[in-house]
Amino acid sequence: MPRPTSTLPKAQHCRAQASDSFQKRFFRFEFVYPKAENIVYKKTPVLTDNVMHYCPGCSHGVVHKIIAEVIEEMGIQDKTIGVSPVGCSVLAYNYLDIDWAEAAHGRAPAVATGISRVHPDRYVFTYQGDGDLASIGCGEIMHACNRGENIVVIFINNAIYGMTGGQMAPTTLLGQVTATTPYGRDAKLNGFPMKLTELLAQLDGTCYVTRQSVHTPANVRKAKAAIRKAFENTRKDKGTSFVEIVSTCNSGWKVTPVEANKWMVDSLVCST
């Protein structure tokens, strides 16, 4: 069979062959396009890109993340106002891209009450530690819950004053060693641990009271569901929702993050 001839001039035909050969050698992947991304996780835009100041192993970062995810999923970023008082979370406004108000030590429920009453269409929540809420702020939280203010209270309980050096808090366990109880908490000297969640659950103004933790992926999901339910209660104007998160403080407890998680499960979770 005769070989097909090219219609190109000889010199032009040689250049075309050379060009084809060059492309085959050096551009063999030219028409291979990447597959579409299969995104399995994406940081919520409600969280800023600021580096958190919390200690490695601290529970605050995880709780910030699930709060931010709930706010995004509910589509309420521009309607949410957080209130943060004195404590490790005093800089929370650097990490969640929502409106924030700062409150004096323990006074976040009072500030949240004022904001909620002036802006009843907003989702108002406080973010407080046990040294803040259960001690100097005990009166504010008791009366806000008793009135049934339409707010969410997120209570981070690590049974110690974390920011100020690891002193005894109202929720410190009996026998627990702190900077101010070097031989362990003694009921005769220091009283018993304050079980604030159980106290608030008995008030008529609270519509939802729960205790959660974030020490395992399963518990993180449960805590997130609890926080979402609390915000949904605000949407329905049901009253005060109180979510306690039993947390770690490895720097205050003077242990490693791994040891802190184990101690929390063995001692704090089981005793609360």
Model-flagged regions — what are they?
Residues 135-152, 156, 160-272:
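Glycine-rich ThDP/TPP pyrophosphate-binding loop and its adjacent helix/strand module
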